[in-house]
Every structure is written in C-alpha cells, then in structure tokens.
Swiss-Prot record:
Record's function text: Involved in the oxidation of myo-inositol (MI) to 2-keto-myo-inositol (2KMI or 2-inosose).
Domain of life: Bacteria
UniProt entry keywords in alphabetical sequence: NAD, Oxidoreductase
Lineage: Bacteria, Pseudomonadati, Pseudomonadota, Alphaproteobacteria, Rhodobacterales
Name the record gives this protein: Inositol 2-dehydrogenase
Gene3D superfamilies in alphabetical order: Dihydrodipicolinate Reductase, domain 2, NAD(P)-binding Rossmann-like Domain
EC number: 1.1.1.18
Length: 334
C-alpha cells in the first residue's frame, strides 16, 4: 500500500519534505498540497510533486490524504494538527507544535481523547547519527551524567530575528534533544547575557547563555550565539562520573594546504542535519502505515513549549532562576 500524503504549507521545508517523500523514501507519495501562497504550492507541484493536486484549505488536504505533514506558519500549527487528530489521520508537525504551551496542551488532550498516538513532532536531532551515538555512550560508558556544555551557533540571522526567537526558534532544539539525551526532566531555567557582539541588531541581545537544571541534578549550560559569523556550529559535551563524551563533528575532508591543517565548517543548518530528516520522515511513514505515530510525541512538544516559555520569561529577568513545572505525564506517553 502506498500512503497518500498531504502537505500543508509548501515553503522551503514543506517542498523539501515533498521531494524527500517522492524521491528518497519509500511507501508514500505526495498526493495533495495547500499553501496560503498558491505560487508556492504550484512551484512544489511543478518541481517535486507532479502527481499532487492543489487544494484550497488544510481541511481539504486532511480529508484527501491518509496522513499529513504540517509545515505551515507556526501560528497555524495548532488548529491544523487538531483537525488531523479529529479526522483520525497521522500527522507530522514541524516545530513548534503550538506557539504557546496551552495550545500544545490542547493537542495532547485531543490525542488522549482519541486513545492513540497520531502526532510526531519534527525534532529531527533525535535521528542524527551523532546524537544517537552520544546517547548510547552516555547510557553505557560515562556513569551518571553530571554536566552538559552545549552551544548553538549560527553565522547570522535576519533583522526580523528578535531576542525571544533565540528561545522559541533556536534553543527549542536543545531543549528537546538534551532532555531526550539524559532521559530526564527540567526543573529550573536561568538566562544571562554576556557582552553583546557588535554584529547584532536592534531588538536582539546576542549572545545568550541559558542555564538549565534537571530533576536528577544535572547542570546544563547552552550558549546561543546567532551572529557568530564563522559558520553553523552545534556543540555538545556530556561530563559523567567516569569521563566525558562529545557530539562528533560532521564528516568533512581534512586538508593540509599552504602550511595549514584544517577542515571546512558548514554554513547552513539544512546541510548539518540533512540525513536525519530522511530518517525521521521514514519513521513517520512506517508508523502512519499502521495508523499511528512514532518518534517525538505531542507530549514532547508540550514539554518543550512549557520549558521554552519559562526560558523566555527568564530573558526578561536576567540572572533569576525560574521553576519549570510539568504536569504528570499521561499514560498514553509512558
């Protein structure tokens, strides 16, 4: 059986997922798309999804598909995911699951009422080979984790990028993947601002340092530096009782040229995690064929949203340690 996939939102990531489903992965075909900008939908169909029909709304795409991908503007995600759940259709939602934690909570409640998982959230780092290997090393070799030192650096960001986006657009990936890496929950968050880079702009305090504490007492520091200039650079070091382990660098050819030994640093986040997108979507398609969902859940999206909201509040009170309070995990997500 070939799954009929509908895509809601055919901007850069939606179109790339359409290409991935039709040309790289197995078991599915993109058969319906929609976008608020019809030109985007037409370009997607012409470029990578020639068999897809262009429909006028998310609801039409959901009705015409076996499973859907929500790749639209973040503020639209909640309503579109809820519509997919109501229709009983497996749904892959790019982050954020919802722009506010209470919206993500409504999605969790709707899925609970349905009685089975239908939502996978697009936290692709869980599928990255480096993170998977690091998690196994942490689990089997380091002893109990004590600390994590992490960094999320971008070469530059556009002028519309503002201080809170460092949390909701950037740190959100670390919030999820470090929780998954440790199999632990956050209990507090703190934000501090070092000296600002001259490469920032009005409305953006850059860099930032976010300090998190987990229920098991692990201390985490995450540097967010989105105007670092030199490249897209993701770092993660776990310090355990018996030793340390680092996230491996992306594969690149080291050279010895002109009396210099070195290797290139990637500039684009899409190149850094390109393989993990393939793995996460194949995981979604496999589960969707059984009428369910796998991978990062709506609960994971909800926890990330709660934590991000607290971190954003901490930006307004630099240095203050704020509690992260989570409700009990529902049995559906045990």
């Amino acid at each position: 059986m070939t799954l009929r996939i509908g895509i809601i939102g055919t901007g850069a990531i939606g179109t790339d997922h359409a290409r991935r489903i039709n040309r790289v992965l197995s078991g599915a075909e993109v058969t319906a798309v929609t976008d608020v900008n019809r030109d985007n939908a037409e370009a997607c169909v012409a470029g990578v999804a020639p068999g897809a029909q262009i429909l006028g709304s998310a609801e039409e795409v959901i009705a015409a598909s076996d499973a859907v991908l929500v790749c639209s503007w973040g503020a639209a995600h909640e309503a579109q995911v809820l519509a997919a759940i109501a229709a009983g259709k497996p749904c892959f939602c790019e982050k954020p699951l919802a722009t506010e934690a209470y919206g993500a909570r409504r999605i969790v409640e709707a899925e609970e009422a349905m009685g089975r998982r239908l939502v996978q959230v697009g936290f692709m780092r869980r599928y990255d080979r480096g993170y998977v290997a690091l998690k196994e090393t942490v689990r089997t070799r380091l002893g109990p984790p004590l600390m994590i030192h992490a960094a999320h650096r971008n070469p530059t960001v556009p002028g519309r990028y503002r201080t809170p986006m460092a949390i909701h657009d950037t740190l959100i990936h670390e919030i999820d993947v470090l929780r998954w890496l440790l199999d632990d929950e956050y209990v507090s968050a703190q934000v501090i601002f070092p000296r600002a880079t001259r490469h920032t702009h009005a409305g953006l305090r850059d860099p930032q340092i976010v300090l998190l504490e987990t229920a098991k007492g692990v201390r985490i520091d995450v540097e967010i530096f989105v105007n670092c200039r030199y490249g897209y650079d993701i770092q993660c070091e776990v310090v355990g009782e018996e030793g340390t382990a680092r996230l491996p660098e992306p594969t690149a050819i080291p050279t010895r040229l002109g009396a210099v030994f070195g290797q290139p640093i990637l500039m684009d986040w899409k190149d850094r995690f390109i393989d993990s997108y393939d793995v996460e979507l194949q995981d979604f398609l496999k589960a969707a064929a059984q009428g369910t969902a796998a991978g990062p859940s709506a609960w994971d999206g909800y926890v990330a949203a709660i934590t991000a909201d607290v971190c954003a509040q901490a930006q307004e009170r630099p240095g203050a340690i704020l509690p992260v309070t989570l409700p009990a995990r529902p049995a559906l997500y045990a």
